[in-house]
Amino acid sequence: MKKITVLVDLYYLKAAVAGIGSYIREFEASCNDHGSNDFKYVFTHDINKLVGNSIFLNSNNKIIRWIFQIRYLIYKQIQLPLKILFSKADYVICPDYIAPYFTFKAKRITVLHDSLFWDHKKNYSFLWNKYFISLINLGMNKGTQIITTSNYSKKNLIKILGSDKSISSVYQSFNFLKTSSSNYKTPENYLLHIGSFEKRKDLITLVKAFKLVDDPNLKLVLAGAQIIN
């Protein structure tokens, strides 16, 4: 029986520090560790050459960031379609919001992690936000399967994209059996927030709200990567 070929796009790992970067790394590892024998997973890049080895990673240089966006556009609309064609992929998975316009016979599975680009436009420049949303829409057709990371995001995306879109929520997993020796001394009772330290996350409001909690034994722990923007 012929295996179903699934092409997984790893390109965005060149620039992703936290959220999407973690998602891509864990997805790639899961495909290798838990993939079905009925599927053949093909990766667009060698992940070991991408992780922590890019000038685009968390750069505060606007020129470098724009160079990445130009290369990203060329890759998505020209190079990735060629990879789809030559790999004879049945499915292509894009974990970074954007799928190419041409996927030939391959069905598209696109991960929209949330609806922030539509809900919080003030966090992005007008032109960039309009451009990015246009790219998202360009990569979607009637057969696109959209994956998001929570039911909350699913409801928001249905309101934005329409109920005719196929949207499924798949929560990100956690290995409760895996333990590690940590040097971090966490309190006995605490609330944990995991996410990058970005202005748009509005962590200041979270800290102010926690300050109102009348429980001296409860602590707030923030964990995540520092992002330049």
Please provide the spans of the model-predicted regions.
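Carbohydrate transferase catalytic cores enriched for Leloir-type hexosyltransferases
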Residues: M1-N229
